[in-house]
Design a protein with these regions (language model features):
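Selected transmembrane alpha-helices and immediately adjacent juxtamembrane segments
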Residues: 1-34, 46, 50, 124-223, ...
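Short helix-loop boundary/capping segments at the starts of domains
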Residues: 24, 28-31, 40, 44-45, ...
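Interfacial helix-start motif at the membrane-water boundary
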Residues: 24-25, 63-68, 228
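Short, flexible micro-motifs
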Residues: 35, 40, 70, 79, ...
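Membrane-embedded helical hairpins/re-entrant loop segments and their flanking transmembrane helices
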Residues: 35-66, 208-213, 239-240
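Structural signal for the C-terminal ends of transmembrane alpha-helices
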Residues: 38-43, 202, 264-265
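Membrane-interfacial helix-loop connectors
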Residues: 70-128, 203-274, 278
Length: 301
Protein backbone atom coordinates (compact mmCIF):
# COMPACT_ATOMS: atom_id res chain seq x y z
CA UNK A 1 0.00 0.00 0.00
CA UNK A 2 1.42 3.39 -1.00
CA UNK A 3 1.45 6.42 1.26
CA UNK A 4 -1.31 8.15 -0.73
CA UNK A 5 -3.58 5.11 -0.57
CA UNK A 6 -3.29 5.07 3.22
CA UNK A 7 -4.35 8.71 3.59
CA UNK A 8 -7.98 9.60 4.34
CA UNK A 9 -10.02 10.67 1.32
CA UNK A 10 -10.59 14.11 2.89
CA UNK A 11 -6.82 14.75 2.99
CA UNK A 12 -6.49 13.73 -0.65
CA UNK A 13 -9.40 15.98 -1.58
CA UNK A 14 -7.88 18.95 0.28
CA UNK A 15 -4.53 18.27 -1.39
CA UNK A 16 -6.13 18.20 -4.83
CA UNK A 17 -7.90 21.51 -4.20
CA UNK A 18 -4.67 23.04 -2.86
CA UNK A 19 -2.70 22.01 -5.94
CA UNK A 20 -5.38 23.12 -8.39
CA UNK A 21 -5.51 26.62 -6.87
CA UNK A 22 -1.75 27.05 -6.64
CA UNK A 23 -1.12 25.77 -10.19
CA UNK A 24 -3.65 28.27 -11.55
CA UNK A 25 -2.19 31.16 -9.57
CA UNK A 26 1.57 30.64 -10.02
CA UNK A 27 1.87 31.87 -13.64
CA UNK A 28 0.23 35.18 -12.70
CA UNK A 29 2.48 35.56 -9.66
CA UNK A 30 5.53 34.94 -11.86
CA UNK A 31 4.46 37.45 -14.54
CA UNK A 32 3.58 40.02 -11.88
CA UNK A 33 6.99 39.58 -10.24
CA UNK A 34 8.82 40.19 -13.52
CA UNK A 35 6.79 43.32 -14.29
CA UNK A 36 7.32 44.59 -10.75
CA UNK A 37 11.06 44.01 -11.16
CA UNK A 38 11.06 45.97 -14.41
CA UNK A 39 9.29 48.90 -12.75
CA UNK A 40 11.81 48.87 -9.89
CA UNK A 41 14.69 49.12 -12.37
CA UNK A 42 13.30 51.41 -15.08
CA UNK A 43 10.64 53.65 -13.47
CA UNK A 44 11.68 56.42 -11.06
CA UNK A 45 9.59 58.89 -9.02
CA UNK A 46 11.19 61.72 -11.00
CA UNK A 47 9.74 60.32 -14.22
CA UNK A 48 6.30 59.99 -12.64
CA UNK A 49 6.46 63.55 -11.29
CA UNK A 50 6.98 65.01 -14.78
CA UNK A 51 3.58 63.65 -15.87
CA UNK A 52 1.59 65.03 -12.91
CA UNK A 53 -1.35 67.31 -13.85
CA UNK A 54 -1.28 70.87 -12.53
CA UNK A 55 -4.54 70.88 -10.55
CA UNK A 56 -5.28 68.93 -7.39
CA UNK A 57 -8.27 66.93 -8.65
CA UNK A 58 -6.31 65.94 -11.74
CA UNK A 59 -3.50 64.66 -9.53
CA UNK A 60 -5.97 62.63 -7.45
CA UNK A 61 -7.34 60.91 -10.55
CA UNK A 62 -3.83 60.52 -11.96
CA UNK A 63 -2.81 58.59 -8.82
CA UNK A 64 -5.99 56.52 -8.97
CA UNK A 65 -5.54 55.37 -12.58
CA UNK A 66 -1.78 55.33 -13.20
CA UNK A 67 -1.59 51.86 -11.62
CA UNK A 68 -3.08 50.49 -14.84
CA UNK A 69 0.12 51.49 -16.66
CA UNK A 70 2.57 50.84 -13.82
CA UNK A 71 1.44 47.62 -12.12
CA UNK A 72 2.90 46.94 -8.70
CA UNK A 73 2.26 44.17 -6.20
CA UNK A 74 1.18 45.31 -2.75
CA UNK A 75 4.04 43.28 -1.25
CA UNK A 76 6.45 46.13 -2.01
CA UNK A 77 4.13 49.07 -2.62
CA UNK A 78 4.60 50.86 0.72
CA UNK A 79 8.36 51.56 0.28
CA UNK A 80 7.59 52.73 -3.28
CA UNK A 81 4.99 55.18 -1.93
CA UNK A 82 7.47 56.45 0.65
CA UNK A 83 9.95 57.00 -2.17
CA UNK A 84 7.33 58.97 -4.12
CA UNK A 85 6.64 61.13 -1.06
CA UNK A 86 10.36 61.76 -0.57
CA UNK A 87 10.49 63.04 -4.17
CA UNK A 88 7.65 65.51 -3.43
CA UNK A 89 4.87 63.57 -5.16
CA UNK A 90 1.82 64.77 -3.16
CA UNK A 91 0.15 62.38 -0.73
CA UNK A 92 -3.19 62.76 -2.53
CA UNK A 93 -1.51 61.24 -5.61
CA UNK A 94 0.70 58.66 -3.87
CA UNK A 95 -1.95 57.12 -1.58
CA UNK A 96 -4.54 56.56 -4.36
CA UNK A 97 -1.75 54.80 -6.27
CA UNK A 98 -1.09 52.69 -3.15
CA UNK A 99 -4.64 51.31 -3.12
CA UNK A 100 -5.30 50.92 -6.86
CA UNK A 101 -1.96 49.82 -8.36
CA UNK A 102 -2.19 46.24 -6.98
CA UNK A 103 -5.78 45.88 -8.25
CA UNK A 104 -6.38 47.71 -11.54
CA UNK A 105 -3.19 46.62 -13.28
CA UNK A 106 -3.68 44.34 -16.34
CA UNK A 107 -2.08 41.25 -14.77
CA UNK A 108 -4.41 41.28 -11.76
CA UNK A 109 -7.46 42.13 -13.87
CA UNK A 110 -6.74 39.21 -16.20
CA UNK A 111 -6.06 36.90 -13.24
CA UNK A 112 -9.44 37.88 -11.76
CA UNK A 113 -11.13 37.33 -15.13
CA UNK A 114 -9.53 33.89 -15.41
CA UNK A 115 -10.26 32.86 -11.81
CA UNK A 116 -13.97 33.66 -12.09
CA UNK A 117 -14.71 31.63 -15.20
CA UNK A 118 -13.87 34.28 -17.81
CA UNK A 119 -16.50 36.63 -16.41
CA UNK A 120 -16.10 40.40 -16.40
CA UNK A 121 -18.52 41.02 -13.52
CA UNK A 122 -16.04 40.50 -10.67
CA UNK A 123 -13.28 42.23 -12.66
CA UNK A 124 -15.32 45.41 -13.15
CA UNK A 125 -16.76 45.52 -9.64
CA UNK A 126 -13.34 44.91 -8.07
CA UNK A 127 -11.74 47.68 -10.13
CA UNK A 128 -14.65 50.04 -9.42
CA UNK A 129 -14.35 49.42 -5.67
CA UNK A 130 -10.62 50.16 -5.74
CA UNK A 131 -11.10 53.38 -7.72
CA UNK A 132 -13.89 54.49 -5.36
CA UNK A 133 -11.68 53.98 -2.30
CA UNK A 134 -8.73 55.72 -3.99
CA UNK A 135 -10.78 58.74 -5.04
CA UNK A 136 -12.27 59.25 -1.57
CA UNK A 137 -8.83 58.89 0.05
CA UNK A 138 -7.38 61.36 -2.45
CA UNK A 139 -10.12 63.91 -1.75
CA UNK A 140 -9.60 63.43 2.00
CA UNK A 141 -5.84 64.00 1.71
CA UNK A 142 -6.16 66.83 -0.80
CA UNK A 143 -8.87 68.86 0.89
CA UNK A 144 -9.22 67.72 4.54
CA UNK A 145 -5.88 66.41 5.83
CA UNK A 146 -3.35 69.03 6.91
CA UNK A 147 0.40 68.44 6.93
CA UNK A 148 2.57 65.50 5.94
CA UNK A 149 1.59 61.85 6.33
CA UNK A 150 5.19 60.68 6.81
CA UNK A 151 6.76 60.18 10.23
CA UNK A 152 9.59 62.52 11.14
CA UNK A 153 11.68 59.63 12.50
CA UNK A 154 10.75 57.27 9.66
CA UNK A 155 12.88 54.36 8.54
CA UNK A 156 15.50 55.44 6.02
CA UNK A 157 14.72 54.03 2.59
CA UNK A 158 17.70 52.59 0.75
CA UNK A 159 17.25 53.66 -2.85
CA UNK A 160 18.78 51.50 -5.55
CA UNK A 161 20.26 53.51 -8.39
CA UNK A 162 20.17 51.46 -11.59
CA UNK A 163 20.77 54.38 -13.97
CA UNK A 164 24.50 53.72 -14.33
CA UNK A 165 24.04 50.08 -15.37
CA UNK A 166 24.34 48.80 -18.93
CA UNK A 167 21.29 47.39 -20.72
CA UNK A 168 22.29 43.79 -20.00
CA UNK A 169 22.96 44.61 -16.33
CA UNK A 170 19.54 46.25 -16.03
CA UNK A 171 17.85 43.18 -17.49
CA UNK A 172 19.75 41.01 -15.00
CA UNK A 173 18.59 43.28 -12.15
CA UNK A 174 14.99 42.96 -13.34
CA UNK A 175 15.18 39.19 -12.86
CA UNK A 176 17.02 39.49 -9.53
CA UNK A 177 14.28 41.80 -8.22
CA UNK A 178 11.61 39.49 -9.70
CA UNK A 179 13.04 36.40 -8.00
CA UNK A 180 13.09 38.15 -4.60
CA UNK A 181 9.49 39.26 -5.02
CA UNK A 182 8.32 35.88 -6.33
CA UNK A 183 9.57 34.02 -3.25
CA UNK A 184 8.29 36.75 -0.94
CA UNK A 185 4.80 36.45 -2.44
CA UNK A 186 4.96 32.66 -2.73
CA UNK A 187 4.88 31.97 0.99
CA UNK A 188 1.63 33.94 1.40
CA UNK A 189 0.14 32.16 -1.60
CA UNK A 190 0.87 28.74 -0.07
CA UNK A 191 -0.85 29.65 3.21
CA UNK A 192 -3.84 31.11 1.35
CA UNK A 193 -4.28 28.02 -0.83
CA UNK A 194 -3.93 25.78 2.21
CA UNK A 195 -6.60 27.72 4.10
CA UNK A 196 -9.03 27.69 1.15
CA UNK A 197 -8.65 23.94 0.68
CA UNK A 198 -9.18 23.25 4.40
CA UNK A 199 -12.33 25.41 4.48
CA UNK A 200 -13.85 23.60 1.51
CA UNK A 201 -13.18 20.13 2.89
CA UNK A 202 -13.33 20.35 6.68
CA UNK A 203 -15.69 23.20 7.63
CA UNK A 204 -19.25 21.81 7.87
CA UNK A 205 -21.63 23.06 5.20
CA UNK A 206 -24.23 24.10 7.80
CA UNK A 207 -21.74 26.56 9.36
CA UNK A 208 -20.91 28.10 5.99
CA UNK A 209 -24.61 28.29 5.13
CA UNK A 210 -25.45 30.08 8.39
CA UNK A 211 -22.66 32.61 7.80
CA UNK A 212 -23.58 33.28 4.18
CA UNK A 213 -27.23 33.73 5.24
CA UNK A 214 -26.11 36.88 7.09
CA UNK A 215 -24.39 38.92 4.34
CA UNK A 216 -22.95 41.60 6.62
CA UNK A 217 -21.36 38.98 8.87
CA UNK A 218 -19.92 37.14 5.87
CA UNK A 219 -18.49 40.37 4.44
CA UNK A 220 -16.82 41.31 7.73
CA UNK A 221 -15.48 37.77 8.15
CA UNK A 222 -13.85 37.70 4.72
CA UNK A 223 -12.46 41.22 5.14
CA UNK A 224 -10.75 40.09 8.35
CA UNK A 225 -9.58 36.92 6.64
CA UNK A 226 -8.11 38.91 3.75
CA UNK A 227 -6.28 41.15 6.22
CA UNK A 228 -4.76 38.16 8.03
CA UNK A 229 -3.83 36.07 4.98
CA UNK A 230 -1.92 38.95 3.32
CA UNK A 231 -2.16 37.39 -0.15
CA UNK A 232 -0.57 38.93 -3.23
CA UNK A 233 -3.07 40.47 -5.64
CA UNK A 234 -1.91 38.33 -8.58
CA UNK A 235 -3.14 35.22 -6.76
CA UNK A 236 -5.90 36.26 -4.36
CA UNK A 237 -8.63 35.95 -7.03
CA UNK A 238 -8.02 32.19 -7.21
CA UNK A 239 -8.43 31.91 -3.44
CA UNK A 240 -11.52 34.13 -3.63
CA UNK A 241 -13.15 32.10 -6.39
CA UNK A 242 -12.69 28.94 -4.34
CA UNK A 243 -14.62 30.61 -1.47
CA UNK A 244 -17.45 31.85 -3.71
CA UNK A 245 -19.73 28.85 -3.22
CA UNK A 246 -19.25 28.94 0.56
CA UNK A 247 -19.74 32.66 1.26
CA UNK A 248 -21.38 34.33 -1.74
CA UNK A 249 -20.49 37.09 -4.20
CA UNK A 250 -20.49 40.23 -2.02
CA UNK A 251 -18.24 38.80 0.74
CA UNK A 252 -15.73 37.55 -1.86
CA UNK A 253 -15.81 40.99 -3.51
CA UNK A 254 -14.91 42.59 -0.17
CA UNK A 255 -12.12 40.01 0.21
CA UNK A 256 -10.64 40.99 -3.16
CA UNK A 257 -11.02 44.76 -2.77
CA UNK A 258 -9.65 45.26 0.73
CA UNK A 259 -6.85 42.65 0.69
CA UNK A 260 -4.36 44.50 -1.53
CA UNK A 261 -5.06 47.78 0.30
CA UNK A 262 -4.89 46.65 3.89
CA UNK A 263 -3.25 43.53 5.27
CA UNK A 264 -0.83 42.56 8.02
CA UNK A 265 2.40 42.96 6.04
CA UNK A 266 1.36 46.32 4.58
CA UNK A 267 0.33 47.62 7.99
CA UNK A 268 3.70 46.67 9.47
CA UNK A 269 5.50 48.46 6.63
CA UNK A 270 3.28 51.55 6.98
CA UNK A 271 4.31 51.85 10.63
CA UNK A 272 7.92 52.33 9.48
CA UNK A 273 7.15 55.31 7.26
CA UNK A 274 3.77 56.90 8.01
CA UNK A 275 2.22 58.71 10.96
CA UNK A 276 0.12 56.59 13.31
CA UNK A 277 -2.77 59.07 13.12
CA UNK A 278 -2.87 58.79 9.35
CA UNK A 279 -2.67 54.97 9.47
CA UNK A 280 -5.72 54.82 11.75
CA UNK A 281 -7.67 57.17 9.51
CA UNK A 282 -6.56 55.22 6.42
CA UNK A 283 -7.74 51.95 8.00
CA UNK A 284 -11.07 53.47 9.02
CA UNK A 285 -11.83 55.02 5.62
CA UNK A 286 -10.82 51.91 3.65
CA UNK A 287 -12.75 49.53 5.91
CA UNK A 288 -15.96 51.57 5.92
CA UNK A 289 -15.98 52.19 2.16
CA UNK A 290 -15.30 48.54 1.29
CA UNK A 291 -17.90 47.34 3.80
CA UNK A 292 -20.64 49.65 2.50
CA UNK A 293 -19.71 49.16 -1.16
CA UNK A 294 -19.70 45.35 -0.93
CA UNK A 295 -22.97 45.29 1.01
CA UNK A 296 -24.70 47.55 -1.53
CA UNK A 297 -23.42 45.42 -4.40
CA UNK A 298 -24.82 42.36 -2.65
CA UNK A 299 -28.20 44.06 -2.21
CA UNK A 300 -28.42 45.19 -5.84
CA UNK A 301 -27.27 41.94 -7.48
Amino acid sequence: MTLFQSLPSSVLQAGAIFLSIIIEALPFVLIGSIISGAIEVYVTPEKVYTFLPKNRLGRIFFGSFIGFLFPSCECGIVPIINRFLEKKVPSYTAVPFLVTAPIINPIVLFATYSAFGNSFKMVLLRALGAILVATILGIFLGFVWEGLIQKENRLAYHEHDFSHLTKSQKILQVFIQAIDEFFDMGRYLVFGCLFASIVQVYVPTRILTSISATPLLAIVLLMVLSFLLSLCSEADAFIGSSLLSSFGFAPVLSFLVIGPMLDVKNLLMMKNYLKTRFIWQFMTIVTLIVLVYSYLVGVML
